[in-house]
Amino acid sequence: MGGGHMSAAQLEAMLNTLPIEITFIDDNNINRFFNEGAKVFKRPGMAIDREVFSCHPPKIEPMVRSIIESFKNHTRDSVPVWMEKQGKPFLVTYYAVRDKKDNYLGTVEVVQDMQFAKEHFTS
């Protein structure tokens, strides 16, 4: 890796330590990875190696397709989506994953519970 080196076990432990949900979808729209831990959005193991669109509710699927298509055609690099779930604020951010030559490699979805931030702004 360009910024140093670590074992696969170290990388996996680091990703599982972060207080966010991470999902990686490859350039063929296939779920390839999600970190472990508590989840706001359920990610069953059977979702791995399946098309990402089959994992979203029908009303959300067009948005997901549009986001991924915008990454593939280089019109966007990230898309933030704010939502409330279970009475808490969440930020779901989709990022285009590109190589050094700007080729699209996939999409990473990051889900972050923003309740901690909200508490800093309430009096």
Residue ranges and their predicted role:
Residues 24, 96-97:
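Hydrophobic beta-strand positions
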Residues 79-85, 97:
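Short acidic-hydrophobic surface loop/beta-edge motif
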Residues 71-80, 90:
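PAS/PAS-like sensory domains
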Residues 2-69, 122-123:
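PAS-family sensory domains
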Residues 88-95:
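A short beta-strand signature within small-molecule sensing/ligand-binding domains used
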Residues 98-123:
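Sensory coupling linkers of modular signal transduction proteins
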